[in-house]
């Protein structure tokens, strides 16, 4: 089962350039802005919260897919939020946050 998760993430990363090229950057910024309440503006969180800025795209993609699929214990609302995004949106947002300075 773990291999399937890795293959899924690898496939999404491979397609990420294509996905980002097809997604309007303003849409990506808008989706990413919805993360600001918890993760800070452009992913730079306050102490005590997880920062997304500068996190490798592959890491964020895998984590979001894990939340979306219910593979992460429901300690936060992330499992519900992740279900609201398509895989392509997740890839685009992961690329956005990876490009932000820590």
Map each language-model feature to its residues.
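C-terminal capping alpha-helices of c-type cytochrome domains
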Residues: 83-102
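Electrostatic cytochrome c docking/interface patches
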Residues: 13-32, 48-50, 66, 101
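The canonical Cys-X-X-Cys-His
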Residues: 33-41, 93
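Gly/Gly-Pro-rich "capping" loops immediately C-terminal to redox-active cysteine motifs
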Residues: 28, 42-71, 80-85
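Inter-heme linker and motif-flanking segments adjacent to c-type heme-binding CXXCH motifs
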Residues: 44, 73, 100-102
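Bacterial N-terminal signal peptides that target proteins for export
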Residues: 1-8
């Amino acid at each position: 089962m773990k291999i399937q998760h890795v293959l899924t993430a690898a496939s999404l990363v491979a397609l990420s350039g294509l996905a980002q090229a097809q997604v309007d950057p303003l849409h990506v910024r808008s989706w990413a802005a919805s993360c600001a309440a918890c993760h800070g503006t452009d992913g730079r969180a306050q102490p005590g919260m997880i920062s997304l800025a500068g996190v490798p795209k592959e890491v964020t993609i895998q984590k979001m897919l894990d939340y979306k699929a219910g593979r992460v214990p429901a300690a936060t609302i992330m499992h519900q939020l992740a279900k609201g995004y398509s895989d392509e949106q997740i890839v685009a947002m992961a690329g956005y946050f990876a490009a932000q300075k820590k």
